[in-house]
Amino acid sequence: MSGNTFGALFTVTTFGESHGPAIGCVVDGCPPGMSLTEADIQPFLDKRKPGQSKYTTQRREEDKVQILSGVFDGKTTGAPIALLIQNTDQRSRDYEDIKNLFRPGHADFTYHYKYGHRDYRGGGRSSARETAARVAAGAIARLYLKRYLNLDIIGYLQQMGDLKLQFENENEIDKNPFFCPNNKQIQELADYVDRLRRQGDSVGARVKILARGVPTGLGDPVFDKLDATLAYAMMSINAVKGVEIGAGFNAVEQLGSHHRDQMTAKGFLSNHAGGILGGIATGQPIEVSIALKPTSSITTPGQTINTEGEEVTVVTKGRHDPCVGIRAVPIAEAMMALVLMDHYLRHKAQCK
């Protein structure tokens, strides 16, 4: 199985399965001399880890990270940084009933026909459990970008199902389990998720990610445009079905006289481009939105086939998120950081 590495200079290779003994990653290309401890990485993993509220999966993983290499006396050496996260709360028995079935909307069917042999426990390699390793790697990138460039990344839930959230205060985002920027809508979100659980169903979401303090000039033309890399990175996240940069699909209805970001001696008058022109950062905030599908792991019975091609009914057991968009926030932040870190190193390598 290939396709487990992301990046050009700052690279991340993840490994492990949902119900295996551990997951982890190897981060290569981190500059030497940066202070780094497990305690620096842990807060980012804590933001993503499961079982923190009744509104997400009840699988309870501590997600304690171990640094195995690449750090000596509290500083990066420039060598590959190996990170390990133990899996401690697997419940593989929940998946015994579906080991010979293909769950609708999951990768079971495609993994089976591509590889001929799959780990059915929690989706194996296709599980979003893999994203914990991305968040750990992204933490290293975020720490570097903040310390050396004063670059900030912030993500939040923008919409759950048909419930649109009004942005009021970014200081509220990390104070609630929904990463919602409006404390007046928290109860509405809680009631929504409770209703979904009772119905045995799920719902999709929209998440927005901002990067502020991005140096002008990051990104490359043509195939390695910054927005192209961001779209590639975001689409690699489980359940993501759409990506918008700046105005995104709203640009379809806009006139050129409105959409163009006019400039003055003091800067841009708008940011419909989302901080990127010609694939290169303008210095304005980079704005990315992602659409996530509703998880197919629900208790509502559905039609499918088994490995023999016979039609059967399936009910998905296990512990799952009613809305995967909630915990996608720190994952999307991590992918933004990995892209910007990689492009920063690429920019330094070829430009003054």
Curated annotation (Swiss-Prot):
It catalyses: 5-O-(1-carboxyvinyl)-3-phosphoshikimate = chorismate + phosphate. FMN binds at R125, S126, S127, N238, A239, G278, K293, P294, T295, S296, S297, R319. Its cofactor is FMNH2. Its EC number is 4.2.3.5. One of its GO terms (cellular component) is cytosol. One of its GO terms (biological process) is aromatic amino acid family biosynthetic process. Reduced FMN (FMNH(2)). Pathway: Metabolic intermediate biosynthesis; chorismate biosynthesis; chorismate from D-erythrose 4-phosphate and phosphoenolpyruvate: step 7/7. NADP(+) binds at R48. Belongs to the chorismate synthase family. This reaction introduces a second double bond into the aromatic ring system. HAMAP family: Chorismate_synth. Homotetramer. This is Chorismate synthase. The gene is aroC.
